[in-house]
Swiss-Prot record:
<keyword id="KW-0812">Transmembrane</keyword>
<dbReference type="GO" id="GO:0140570">
    <property type="term" value="P:extraction of mislocalized protein from mitochondrial outer membrane"/>
</dbReference>
<keyword id="KW-0472">Membrane</keyword>
<comment type="function">
    <text>Outer mitochondrial translocase required to remove mislocalized tail-anchored transmembrane proteins on mitochondria. Specifically recognizes and binds tail-anchored transmembrane proteins: acts as a dislocase that mediates the ATP-dependent extraction of mistargeted tail-anchored transmembrane proteins from the mitochondrion outer membrane. Also plays a critical role in regulating the surface expression of AMPA receptors (AMPAR), thereby regulating synaptic plasticity and learning and memory.</text>
</comment>
<dbReference type="InterPro" id="IPR003960">
    <property type="entry name" value="ATPase_AAA_CS"/>
</dbReference>
<dbReference type="InterPro" id="IPR041569">
    <property type="entry name" value="AAA_lid_3"/>
</dbReference>
<dbReference type="GO" id="GO:0005741">
    <property type="term" value="C:mitochondrial outer membrane"/>
</dbReference>
<dbReference type="GO" id="GO:0005778">
    <property type="term" value="C:peroxisomal membrane"/>
</dbReference>
<dbReference type="Pfam" id="PF17862">
    <property type="entry name" value="AAA_lid_3"/>
</dbReference>
<keyword id="KW-0496">Mitochondrion</keyword>
<keyword id="KW-1278">Translocase</keyword>
<keyword id="KW-0547">Nucleotide-binding</keyword>
<feature type="topological domain" description="Cytoplasmic">
    <location>
        <begin position="43"/>
        <end position="362"/>
    </location>
</feature>
<dbReference type="GO" id="GO:0045211">
    <property type="term" value="C:postsynaptic membrane"/>
</dbReference>
<feature type="transmembrane region" description="Helical">
    <location>
        <begin position="20"/>
        <end position="42"/>
    </location>
</feature>
<dbReference type="GO" id="GO:0005524">
    <property type="term" value="F:ATP binding"/>
</dbReference>
<dbReference type="InterPro" id="IPR051701">
    <property type="entry name" value="Mito_OM_Translocase_MSP1"/>
</dbReference>
């Protein structure tokens, strides 16, 4: 009965032009409101939103500093660009590294020279710069300093890549960030992608690896292979590690140029001590050769810490003297360095594990 009361012409008649426009307008408004509402909700629940905004501001600032303003970057490239280091702001040069003259000379010949003198090597594929360089050896021996000095002296853009930058909770985002690393480096070439503690990121693959991590590593290596096929590409991936045995064999294949940065010998320790104490107030009677002989097994960072302890002894004597007859801190003496050596040896021989085991846990 109800259907009979509805005029059939109102059901079958076509919509008018104004009605169609009105319907499309309402659908457009509804779609826009739905889109922005969902986008706002996703941004609201994203715990990294604030960090992403700050990273974008930092990236834009760094891009202006290095003189790159007309290059368009994607959202993912902006996230990676936040880890750019301006070569002009890096204070590290070859003169700040002592005891590694042979490594520095080989780096200059095999990595820097083929890029700075490209016109001399254009006709040879064998003389092209390597796409992967590995610095390995004990901690505190100058691996990171060498990487920064290489970028500084060669004028490369330096991307200090943190593995945590490539991790994202959304599926597929890590792969996009990995791709952005290489696309950004190519846009900014010549450039160095430096990965410190590379073994924590590209270690041996196993069946227990998470699916997202395995996919990210696979894509990273695939993009890396793309650098090898493009002989005009001026992008170098440089890694540093204390545990080269933990690196995946596929990664080692992609890093054919390797430098072993070992603990310094007596001559190298003397050179390092000269560099550390070069601008310090030191007595002329100090025998650095003797100090170098007594510091067997010390790394470069150990020697710096030892010299700092010796300098602090001079400060303590000045502060605690009963009748301050002098208003200046005395120079570093031989006995100050001897005491600092003994302190460093005790801390090195104590053993961190043994010290922690003596701490009560309840």
């Amino acid at each position: 009965m109800v259907l009979k009361e509805i005029p059939t012409e109102n059901i079958t008649r076509p919509l008018g032009r104004n009605e169609v426009i009105g319907l499309l307008f309402r659908l457009t408004i509804f779609g826009a409101v739905t889109y922005f509402t969902i986008k706002w909700m996703v941004d609201a629940i994203d715990p990294t939103r604030k960090q992403k905004v700050e990273a974008q501001k930092q990236a834009e600032k760094l891009m202006r500093q290095i003189g790159v303003q007309n290059v368009k970057l994607s959202e993912y490239e902006m996230s990676i660009a936040a880890h750019l280091v301006d070569p002009l702001t890096m204070q590290i040069t070859w003169h700040d590294i002592a005891g590694l003259d042979e490594v520095i000379t080989e780096l200059k010949d095999t990595v820097i020279l083929p890029i700075q003198k490209r016109h001399l090597f254009e006709g040879s594929r064998l003389l092209q710069p390597p796409k992967g360089v590995l610095l390995y050896g004990p901690p505190g021996c100058g691996k990171t300093l060498i990487a920064k000095a290489t970028a500084k002296e060669a004028g490369f853009r330096f991307i200090n890549l943190q593995p945590s930058t490539l991790t994202d909770k959304w599926y597929g985002e890590s792969q996009k960030l990995a791709a952005a690393v290489f696309s950004l480096a190519i846009k900014l070439q010549p450039s160095i992608i430096f990965i410190d503690e590379i073994d924590s990121f590209l270690r041996n693959r196993s069946s227990s690896d998470h699916e997202a991590t395995a996919m990210m590593k696979a894509q990273f290596m695939s993009l890396w292979d793309g650098l090898d096929t493009d002989y005009n590409c001026q992008v170098i991936i440089m890694g540093a590690t204390n545990r080269p045995q933990d690196l995946d064999s596929a990664i080692l294949r992609r890093m054919p140029t390797r430098f072993h940065i070992n603990q310094p010998n007596v001559r190298q320790r003397k050179d390092i001590l000269k560099l550390i104490l070069e601008n310090e107030n030191v007595e002329s009677a100090v025998e650095l050769s003797e100090i170098a002989k007594q510091t067997d097994g010390f790394s470069g960072s150990d020697l710096r810490e030892m010299c700092r302890d010796a300098a602090l002894l001079c400060v303590r004597d000045f502060v605690h003297q009963e009748s301050p007859e002098e208003d200046f801190i005395r120079p570093i003496r031989q006995e100050d360095l001897q005491r600092a050596i003994e302190k460093m040896k005790k801390s090195k021989s104590a053993g961190v594990h043994e010290a922690f085991m003596q701490v009560p846990l309840d």
